[in-house]
């Protein structure tokens, strides 16, 4: 089937002007996730913030109750006993100066990055490489920590990091099309709660303004915010 015809078919039945209750929206998205692979179900929040101002940044991490369905590769910058702890917890890549050199050379073999506090002067050199990818370790989201085992377990077990983009949008994957509707809704409500709690002091007016859900290859479905809040 031609791409244009496929898109037209999957968009059928979606009212672009309507806000759907979350359960109905997820059902519609799942029905239209017809690719041969297990598509990721994603959510996007349009927030009433201007991230150009330091007091309007939104960032955090949340453990989704049903995981993400995705296997993350976790890299840890640590030495000695903490490096051993990271390996025992299942970290995919562990190192210190050697790992910094690999990353500086363009080899990034992880999706999530964790560091012990003493490693940050070294890891700081990687800001231009890891920063744009959203991978820079940060104590505010628990990726600069002495509890490397806990951080690795969290990353492997379904922790989702979120961060507002320039246009005031937070996007995140909250599961797979193979998940039940109930599990996806539970994950969405957990993420929404975390985003709500991360509301910055500088935010004015309505905080969560618009919400939409979609699958990797499918169309977006607008959500009634009241059905995912609280």
UniProtKB/Swiss-Prot annotation:
InterPro entries: Ribosom_uL1_bac-type, Ribosomal_uL1, Ribosomal_uL1-like, Ribosomal_uL1/biogenesis, Ribosomal_uL1_3-a/b-sand, Ribosomal_uL1_CS. GO terms for molecular function: rRNA binding; structural constituent of ribosome; tRNA binding. Gene3D superfamilies: 3.30.190.20, 3.40.50.790. GO terms for cellular component: cytosolic large ribosomal subunit. It holds the Pfam family Ribosomal_L1. One of its GO terms (biological process) is translation. CDD domains: Ribosomal_L1 (cd00403). Keywords: Repressor, Ribonucleoprotein, Ribosomal protein, RNA-binding, rRNA-binding, Translation regulation, tRNA-binding. Part of the 50S ribosomal subunit. Belongs to the universal ribosomal protein uL1 family. Binds directly to 23S rRNA. The L1 stalk is quite mobile in the ribosome, and is involved in E site tRNA release. Protein L1 is also a translational repressor protein, it controls the translation of the L11 operon by binding to its mRNA. This is Large ribosomal subunit protein uL1. It comes from Rhodopseudomonas palustris (strain BisA53). The gene is rplA.
């Amino acid at each position: 089937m031609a791409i244009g015809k496929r898109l037209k078919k999957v968009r059928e039945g979606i009212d672009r002007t309507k806000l759907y209750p979350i359960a109905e929206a997820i059902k519609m998205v799942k029905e239209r996730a017809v690719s041969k692979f297990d598509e990721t179900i994603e959510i996007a929040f349009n927030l009433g913030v201007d991230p150009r101002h330091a007091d309007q940044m939104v960032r955090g991490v949340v453990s989704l109750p049903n995981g993400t369905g995705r296997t993350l590769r976790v890299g840890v910058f640590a030495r000695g006993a903490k490096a051993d702890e990271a390996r025992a917890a299942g970290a995919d890549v562990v190192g210190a100066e050697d790992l910094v050199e690999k990353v500086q050379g363009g080899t990034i073999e992880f999706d999530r990055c964790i560091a012990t506090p003493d490693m940050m002067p070294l890891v700081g050199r990687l800001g231009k490489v890891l920063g744009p990818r959203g991978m820079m370790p940060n104590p505010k989201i628990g990726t600069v920590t002495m509890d490397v085992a806990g951080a690795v377990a969290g990353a492997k077990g379904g922790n989702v990091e979120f961060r507002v983009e320039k246009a005031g949008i937070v996007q995140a994957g909250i599961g797979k099309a193979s998940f039940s509707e109930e599990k996806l809704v539970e994950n969405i409500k957990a993420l929404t709660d975390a985003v709500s709690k991360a509301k910055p002091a500088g935010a004015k007016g309505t905080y969560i303004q618009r919400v939409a859900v979609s699958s990797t290859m499918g169309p977006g479905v607008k959500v009634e915010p009241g059905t995912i809040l609280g």
